[in-house]
Amino acid sequence: KDAVLKAAEDGAQMVLCTGGMSVDPDDRTPGAIRELGAKIITYGAPVLPGAMFLLAYYSPGNGIPDVPVMGLPGCVMYAERTVFDLILPRVLAKDKIDDIEDYGQGGLCLGCEICVFPECGFGK
């Protein structure tokens, strides 16, 4: 929680959190993001790999724009394509994301032998 606060208040345009994103009682990342007072857009996404993705917006105040805070599930470390590949370009374009449920159509990466992402059905 403190690290996210510091990053946002120091001017970070985005904060990525990894680890502790499951539903186990000792997974604390989602709770820490909630404690910030961040507006949780989603904790869970209809996308595989990446179902335990969290997206929130934290408002530091003092005229500082809302900071997107993403909780990234472990799959982003090993899977070739994940929910992060779908969401990151939109966050970088400052698109306020509120339509996560739309990823349910085409939300399964088939792990093709030869990956042609983004020229495939993943995330469409």
Give a label for each model feature.
Residues 1-123:
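Short glycine/threonine-rich loop/turn motifs
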